Amino acid sequence: MALPSDFRQYGKAAELLFTGDFMEADEGYRLGFLNHLVEETELEPKTMEIARKIAAGPPIAIRLSKLMLYKGLEFDLETALKMAAAAETITLTSYDHGEGTQAIRESRKPLYEGR
C-alpha cells in the first residue's frame, strides 16, 4: 500500500499498515485512497475506460508526468522545479505537442507518435 502524499492521511495509512485492519471501500473513497468507487460489475469497464484514456494521451508527456509524480517528492524544491521546467521544455518542443495543438484546431483526435 503506497502512502498518500497528503500528510493528513498519514495517520490513517499508518493505522492500516501497522494493524493490518481492513477498510471499507466507501471509507477509502471518502479519505481519498480510491479515485473511483464503482459496483463490482463496473470495475473492469471503468478500469478499461481509464486505461484507454491514458493510452490515447501523448506518451512523452505522460512518461514525464509519471516521473515527476513518483520521483518529485524525493527532491528538494529547487531540484523539483528544475526538473519540472526541463519536462515542460521537452514536452512543449515535442512533435506530439504540435500534433495535439493541430488536432484541437482541426477538431479531431490527435495521432501521437511518442516523439
Task: Describe each PLM feature range.
Residues 72, 112-113:
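Short active-site-adjacent structural elements
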Residues 76-81:
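Short beta-strand->loop
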Residues 1-60, 93-94, 98-102, 108, ...:
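Crotonase-fold acyl-CoA enzyme core
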Residues 16, 68, 87-91:
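Helix-loop "lid/cap" segments that line or gate small-molecule binding pockets
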Residues 69-75:
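Short, charged, surface-exposed hinge/linker loops at domain edges
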